[in-house]
Amino acid sequence: MNVRAAAALTLAAALAACGPPEPDPAPKPAPVKAAPPSEVKVSSPTLDAVRARGRLNCGVHQGLAGFAYPDQRGVWRGFDVEICRAIATAVLGDAQAVNFVPLAATERLNALQEKRVDVLSRNTSWTFSRDASLGFDFPAVTYFDGQGFLARRSLNLASADELSGARICVQAGTVTEQNLAEYFREREVKYTPVVVASEEEAREKYQAEACDAFTADISALASARSILNDPASHVILPTVISKEPLGPVVRQDDAVWADIVRWTVFAIVLAEEAGLTSKTVEQARETATRASVQRLLGKRDNLGAMLGLKPDWAFQVIRQVGAYNEIFDRNLGPRSSLRLTRGFNRLWTADPPGLLFAPPMR
């Protein structure tokens, strides 16, 4: 190396040494710490309104066997009805503190938007547009369904694709109507839609042979078939043309209320996971040693305070209403007239597994 090159290198090293110091590394963010439950401040206009009223206003179907219907004494029964009762229990401590508001499909979302009801529990599908643009939240799925077709067994149909030229009853103002049109358009199958105002009217027209088939959620078809004159003469075709995640709906302007509804549903699922029932939960609250069960039943950590609820809110829900499997079995399953199988509504831990899942309560 010549003298000039060596001098240049020496000068460069000197300049580098005199340059600005390296900046200090950015400070690490402090870890996120949850405030103790008792110190969490809860603000929910809906919760305040329900407590001031002393009753939950819950929107339900006008009459759908298995899901929502008044019995001969005028007492509301059904799967969706019991979800209402579970929410009322969580918030008010009383499963009977519910005003049931029967709503047609065309008015159900308006009723929620206008605050005529606090929550909608009316076999309503969770869709992108309802969630993203209409100002609603879907806290949890209570029933995984799909759209199907009811037809007379005498037609010997193997699938819905054989309904070319058929008259098909469908309820107005529903996702069902849109699914029907898209399905047959994509398959270039011609049909005649018989659009009616309610599922009851669709069933009556189908019974009177004013239409050849009836399309709705499969659970609704099972409900309709159970009250036809001769249920065995009708079959639900194996074709399923959509996925319909059904569950309660709330307004998007109250995050705490959405959490209350969400975790009420999760509580009845967690109860089934833990093997708890309305008959065993009182003893379990006294004897449970598993931390997850103690938290669920309010024996430790007081998680309910984070939602403005009492420590034993989930315990009361399970004691007064039941675990998910109890609610399903008596309204839709083997103890009901519908005798539906659990299908996708099995627990994720079942064999074979279903889609029913609840995050950990901790």
Positions of the model-derived regions?
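Bacterial N-terminal signal peptides that target proteins for export
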Residues: 1-7
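Sec-exported extracytoplasmic/periplasmic mature domains
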Residues: 51-55, 88-96, 113-117, 154, ...
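C-terminal functional modules
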Residues: 303-362
